[in-house]
Structures are given as C-alpha cells and as structure tokens.
Amino acid sequence: MKKILFMDTTLRDGEQSPGVNLNEQEKLQIARQLERLGIHVMEAGFAAASEGDFQSVKRIANTIQNATVMSLARAKESDIRRAYEAVKGAVSPRLHVFLATSDIHMKYKLCMSKEDVLDSIYRSVTLGKSLFPTVQFSAEDATRTSRDFLAEAVEVAIRAGANVINIPDTVGYTNPEEYYSLFKYLQESVPSYEKAIFSCHCHDDLGMAVANSLAAVEGGALQVEGTINGIGERAGNAALEEVAVALHIRKDFYKAEPSMTLKEIKATSTLVSRLTGMVVPKNKAIVGANAFAHESGIHQDGVLKEVTTYEIIEPALVGESQNLFVLGKHSGRHAFTEKMKELGYEFTNDERDAVFEAFKKLADRKKEITEEDLRALMLGEAAFAAQQYNITQLQVHFVSNSTQCATVVLKDEEGNVFEDAATGSGSIEAIYNAIQRILGLECELADYRIQSITQGQDALAHVHVELKEGAHQVSGFGVAQDVLEASARAYVHAAGKLKSFIQLVK
C-alpha cells in the first residue's frame, strides 16, 4: 500500500485569503502544529515577497525539526537565492520554483515563447539544485496547458534535477476524470517520470478540489498539496484533512495510506480558524461542529443501537474530544504542565509560570476547564505575549440614554503607560474609540465576530475583528471569559498590527 505525503501551504497559499494577515508569531504557532500533525512538507511562505515574509520563513526554517521547510520562488535567480538564504538553516530545506506553461499565461502574463519557458525552467531548476538538496517544480496552470508541451516542460525540469513535479489546477478548472487522465498521460509520456515524485495542487473554484486530489492519487500522485480547512485565495484550496481522512477510510479503494497524524486534525483546524479568523462552517466535513451530530430520530436510534449504522468516522480518529472536564482550580503546576505536554505544548520556565498564572485566574472563575479551554488559553497568551500593546485596565460605565463611556489603560513593550477615555453608542464602540485615541488611529471596523469556545454560562469568548485604514486591512483576536475584555483584546491585537504596518510602509 503506497504512502501519500502531504505538502501544506496554509502559511503561503492559505494566507492569501482576503482579510487574512498573520504575524510571525502566529505563523510559527501554525508551523509547530503542522509539525505535530505530521505534515511532510510545509511551504513557509514566499521569501522574496517582502522582508517580513523572509524573516517569517527563516524563523520557521530554523525552528522546525521534523518536516521539510520550503519557500516559493519564481523562476528568477534573485528569488531562488533569497529562498535559499531563508531556508538554508532548516533540517530539511526545499525550493519550490514555478513557471506558467499554459498558452494564455505565456502570451499575456509572461510574454514568453515556449522555447523561452523551457530554457527558463532548465536554468532555474539547475540553479536551485546547486543550492538545495531537493527542488520542486510547478507548471503553473498545468490543467490548461497543452498536454504535449506540459510533458516536455516536465521532462526538462526532471533532467535539470527536479525531485518533485507539481501539476497544479491553478484556477480550479479541471474535473476528476480529466485530472486522473492527465497524470496517467504524464506517466506514459515523460521519459524520466520514475526519477521524480509527482504532486497535485487543486483549487476549489468549481467545488472539486478534494475530489480532484483523490483522482490524482488514483492516477499516480504520491504527494497532495493543500491547506488546513481548505482556506486560500478565491474559493480556496483542497482541504488536506478531508483528503487524508478519505484516503484512510477508503484505503480499500485507493490502496493508499495518508502520512499524517490524524488525531491532530481537530486541534490544527481550530488553531488555523482562530488565528486567521476564518470560521469553519458547521456542516464542513471532518472538522465542522455538526460533522458527528445526529438530529434525525431514526439516525439517533440507529447510532444508539450500533454506531456504524450512520457514522463511518470515529470522532476520536481526528481528535474530536468529548470536551470533558480535565483540570480545575485545585490542579497544581505539575498536573497542569503534564496536561499541556499531552496536548503538544512545551514551555520555558518563564513561559510556564505566565501560562499557569493565567490558568489559575481562569480556574477561579470557571468551574471546569476543558481541553478546548486550555488550547484557547494558550492561543490567547501567545497573542498577548507577542503584542506591542497590552491592556492593563478597562472600565466601562453608563453616561446617558444609550451612551457609554470607556476608560482604557495600555502598556507598551517598553513599559510606557497610556490612558484615555471615550464615549460611544455602546460599550464596544466606546472601548474601541478610546483605543483609537491612544494609538492615534482612524480606522474602520470592517468585521466583528464573537464565538463561544465551550458551552455553559462560564464559557470563554473568542472575538475576531478586522480593521481597515485605506488599502491596509488586518485582523486580530482576543480570548477572555468576559466579552468586553475579549473584544478589547481583539481590537488592541489588530490595531497594533495596523499601526506597525502603516509605519513600515511610510
């Protein structure tokens, strides 16, 4: 039975989703969770895109120990050398170089002939191979490329030293039958086919990304590319968790086994959703809130008698816990630390003390602490530690009619304290106006969403906001038991990002 490897591009293709703007610390959190998930290759970003991207890719490359770290690059020497500088410190570095091969891209975007494209592929892969132990080449818009030219381009790339060949459905144009046929065609038409691993990369514009990825596996692909929760530009990418579970459940059909730690799927999905602010639909396969719910009386009766009557996936397979109580206010530091290790978190002594203090404060207010609470606590504390500004005091009081007044005290990284007050037509508006006054921002609240992390009256609140000033748009989140505190934390998180970004581009 063949093993299917996974290349995750949540940190590159996924971050291109409109409204998603991850900072370096958030990208590192996701990278560490992808490592726990057992992802074989993670595309950490596009190192040549900006200094910020370069630094994020470099930090991830220098941190991750058990996965290949890859940077995207155009078929340009400057991009390739920049990618090398970013990932050379990785345990297993890889270059991902791409060039379009379809007629429409060659004519209108590249303004290059077929001969020029083939020459560029050869030169860029050759350079990459002189720097990197492994090189992946992607024929952008492969599914709209003439098959004979695609086979020629792939052969040139392999002869130049490419170890992995990606056949992307860049605009989500193909269907499963066509995609399967394309992989079979390349198997028969590329003389050096056996010298490389073939990979698929599907977009979901026509809603077939996962189906196309599975068809590619049938056709011979040994690597599947995609993102967690299927996020990405336009309609998104293939959801890796769906492909992996489909391969596992239907291994009898696909004769393949996913190389992924499936029990980490739920935790990974939740982390990506909360950091990006992209809510997972309740009815989404594998990780949606209703994925294992049954409301029909007939279904409920069947499941109670024999679970396999209506459930083909055991919730525990993907790490879907029953959200049972795990810790409380009487739990000690050792029990807390051991539980966090079990969930995949490691701390320095200082980090452990800070997180344990936050846990004790939560436990004093909340009777039962669940695994979801602990993950949310870690998420909130990580964001808190990485912020330029943090809230030290928040007070809201009624003025008149529907007017509220908020007093906010912030402290920056250097210990400077800032205080201001403002009014608004509600508590949230008053708080946000006060924060704007302190930070000197005039921005628009483009989105505000609140979710309950767990059930019950004492549940933690997760607030996501998006702020917009001119062409700049950023997101932030806050976690707290009090909705107003969570809302304030989210706004400060986003506003700090926005202020830094504006200062950077000035």
UniProtKB/Swiss-Prot annotation:
Pfam families, alphabetized: HCS_D2, HMGL-like, LeuA_dimer
Where, by residue number, does Mn(2+) bind? 13, 201, 203, 237
Q: Where is this region: Regulatory domain?
A: 390-506
- Predominant subcellular localization, coarse grouping: cytoplasm
**InterPro entries reported for this sequence:** 2-IPM_HCS-like, 2-isopropylmalate_synth_dimer, AIPM/Hcit_synth_CS, Aldolase_TIM, LeuA/HCS_post-cat, LeuA_allosteric_dom_sf, LeuA_bact_synth, PYR_CT
GO terms (molecular function) for this protein are: 2-isopropylmalate synthase activity; acetyl-CoA C-acetyltransferase activity; manganese ion binding
Is Cytoplasm one of the keywords? Answer: yes
Q: What EC number(s) has UniProt assigned to this enzyme? A: 2.3.3.13
According to the UniProt record, one GO cellular component term is:
cytoplasm
Extract the NCBIfam families matched here.
leuA_bact (TIGR00973), PRK00915.1-3 (NF002086), PRK00915.1-5 (NF002088)
**Annotated family:** Belongs to the alpha-IPM synthase/homocitrate synthase family. LeuA type 1 subfamily.
Protein name as catalogued: 2-isopropylmalate synthase
Which organism is this protein's natural source? Answer: Bacillus thuringiensis (strain Al Hakam)
